[in-house]
A protein has these predicted regions:
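Generic N-terminal simple sequence motifs
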Residues: 1-2, 174
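Extreme N-terminus of proteins, especially the signal/transit-peptide cleavage junction
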Residues: 2-8
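C-terminal "cap" of GNAT-fold acetyltransferases
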Residues: 7, 24-27, 55-56, 84, ...
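Acetyl-CoA-dependent GNAT
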Residues: 12-95, 107-109, 113, 146-150, ...
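Conserved phosphate-binding and hydrolysis motifs of nucleotide-dependent enzymes
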Residues: 62, 66, 101-103, 141
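Conserved glycine-rich acetyl-CoA-binding loop
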Residues: 90-108, 115-117, 128-135, 139
């Protein structure tokens, strides 16, 4: 008898998820940020972030294992978004859930949200030392935008969503409207 693979669900965050998302986000960023950095307070304040942005969680077998924060241009949480772009912030996956496609599923979900909203591109900042995350972004077709780099250790990556774009997954599919369904899949 073989066990079924865990079932992954991506859904909007609920208040009951705030503590888990805070913990996962802080733990995900801990290896890359100095312990005394004020950024930890921002990472941990999921409730406040949820009031000014859109957060989705990845859940496996009823447990939150990751999250993605999406912000529009002009949001207090937008760092690099320009008009007509959707910015991804604070992408986090529980270290024990890594390597199972959770991060990729969250990023792909966010890309579908951006397409459904008619945005021209997705944009995000990432640290060069976040090797696992960079592999996901590179594999999906994100490209570095050196002219938008705002810190020597942080890259700005973009993913074009318009027709003829260079990203591997740039073809729009009208069935991919994330507002209509909560994504779930086995991994």
């Amino acid at each position: 008898v073989t066990a079924s693979p865990p079932h992954l669900v991506i859904r909007p965050i609920e208040a009951r998820d705030f503590a888990a998302v805070s913990l996962i986000t802080v733990e995900s960023y801990r290896p890359f940020i100095r312990p005394d950095d004020d950024y930890f307070a921002l990472l941990a304040d999921t409730e406040r972030r949820a009031s000014a942005s859109e957060i989705v969680v990845a859940e496996v077998s009823g447990q939150v294992v990751g999250s993605l924060t999406m912000v529009e241009w002009g949001s207090p949480y937008a760092d690099v978004a320009q008009q007509d772009e959707l910015e991804f912030r604070m992408i986090a996956v529980n270290p024990r859930a890594r390597g199972h496609g959770v991060g990729t599923a969250l990023v792909e979900y966010g890309i579908r949200v951006a397409r459904a909203r008619g945005r021209s591109r997705v944009v995000l900042s990432t640290m060069d030392v976040m090797v696992e995350a960079r592999r996901i972004y590179d594999r999906l077709g994100f490209a570095e935008a050196p002219d938008r780099r705002w810190h020597p250790a942080i890259s700005v990556l973009t993913f074009p969503l318009h027709r003829g774009a260079t990203g591997q997954r740039s073809q729009q599919n009208s069935a991919d409207d994330p507002r209509k369904v909560t994504e779930s899949r086995d991994f």
